[in-house]
Amino acid sequence: MEPEKIQTSLPENAYRELKPGEEYTPVMPASSNPKEVTPYSVTMGVVMAVVFSAAAAFLGLKVGQVFEAAIPIAIIAVGMGSVLGKKNMLGQNVIIQSIGASSGVIVAGAIFTLPALYILGLDAAFWQVFLSSLFGGLLGIVLLIPFRKYFVKEMHGKYPFPEATATTEVLVSGEKGGSQAKLLAVAGLVGGLYDFVVGTFGLWTESVSTRICEWGAVAADKFKVVFGLNTSAAVLGLGYIIGLKYAMIITAGSCLVWFVIVPVVGSLTEAVDPAAMLSLLGVTRADIVADPQSIFTAENLFAFIGKPIGIGGIAMAGIIGIIRQSKIIRQAVGLAVSEFGGGKSAAAAPERTQRDISMKRILTILIATLISVFVFFHFGLLDGWVQSVTAILIVFIIAFLFTTVAANAIAIVGTNPVSGMTLMTLILSSLVLVSVGLSGTTGMTAALVIGGVVCTALSMAGGFITDLKIGYWLGTTPRKQEAWKFLGTFVAAATVAGVMIILNKSYGFVGEGALVAPQANAMAAVIQPLMTGGQTPWMLYFCGAALALVLTSIGVPALAFALGMFIPMELNAPLVVGGLVAWFVSGRSKDEGLNKARFDRGTLIASGFIAGGALMGVVSAVLKFVGVDWFLSGWASSNAAEWTGLAMYLVLIGYFAWHTLRAKKEE
């Protein structure tokens, strides 16, 4: 029997909100029976999980950035299918991407917390790192599945899902071939080469700031006012897909920190004793303690005042989100309890594209995972039953409640604020553990491993919603994605644990030539005073929480705004640039059909920029790992390199707009 022919482009209503009574029909409709899970797709997925886990762990610990693995894996899956002459690979490619993308999320969860064990001089064995990552990943999967339908189906068109959009365009274009695949390939080549030249050779800088001008340097030093802009093609593409509305809200958060809070606090240089300031903020970073006056640089004021306010805002926005989504949470829990008790057994079977793992099975896996985590804590970390029960309750409650927050953040900006949420987890867990008699070395180890489990769970929840949205747009079977995600999680956790042990022995995380591991260093700095009676910036956390309440009351999305406060300005400002390009190209004509064609073409080019940048990020990581150093550090640190970067960025924007405006209505 000849397989049913599958369409090779996304439907017109893929990215917009549906009209009343309108249904979304995916690329592979529910009536079709596409190949999804095959020996080829599973093997390729596992290989991708191993390779990208190792690469992401190294790059993340080296520079603190974990590249998103979903896009480069999708490109490789499409490319391999083409090389091997395989046809109708869409379903299999989604499975490859879903298994392989476990790498980036598990890595993010592990490297943000667990290296802090080594930084604090607490040795961690392979099994501790592995089990912490594995259990966190499993919790993230099972806690997200009940919310899949809400985020990917009921909220269709309401969230931009930037990373899922880019990955879906890659997969669809690969299946279609022809002009769309060529356009994506050209955009990927342009974006990839642009970012590769910056990252590997340093011919121009990746970011520019107002410090390159004399007046800008004066403004930074005297008034603590600095404006920064990341010039990478990938972030420009991300801004296009996010759109102008959310980009402006995110950047407004950055503007509040950099143009109001930092200058105001910076103006107190003469009035405030720097040593007292360090004590008040709980700053323990060696270089600042050695030179207290350096706390008043714009960058340090952002790190120690702006970021904590952002963390408080993220936490409160999360709590507000939990309250607002309490109805969905109650429905998911009610469905689980009802099905577990056999109440839904007679219900009609859902169509193929809406079939999840049964609630009974999800609850079984959840209970088994929680029991395993309890055993891990009780026999591997803690002594008493009270401490073990307390630890498991912290993990479950925070992971359960913040799962929706992580998914929400990914749906809006494609960036999961796990480090901010994990800092709050560490603070809360440390306070609770101290109250049940745990402190010092044992307390720090326990809090960090608890943080590792929660961080990985939230990272997985955010990353997995991307996979499920891709599956929804394309028409894969959710149950198959969910089931095989467990395998990807196991493989990624084992790889990350092995790589982290090797990197600790090869480079270390403290001392000369050590890996930077910035997030883990931040975790170590936060947890040490909590467990040893030091100072914690509670007032800043409360300020952020109060700000989130005010923003919510006036109708401004608090999570997006708080994310802007936490994420550096230079990464947020280019989102507005990308959003402005989207607004410009999609409103130039009076012909709505032409505007839509231009916007769609721009989405494809932006996806190419993101994909090319992500793929070249992997190449750069591999080159760094094998010791290839082509970076012109002397030139790259000069003002001339920054001016060159600004000029090249303007050329890139011009190319993006020109190439997008070439769209024809029929396209």
Tell where the protein language model's regions lie, with residue ranges.
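Alpha-helical multipass membrane-protein architecture
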Residues: 1-667
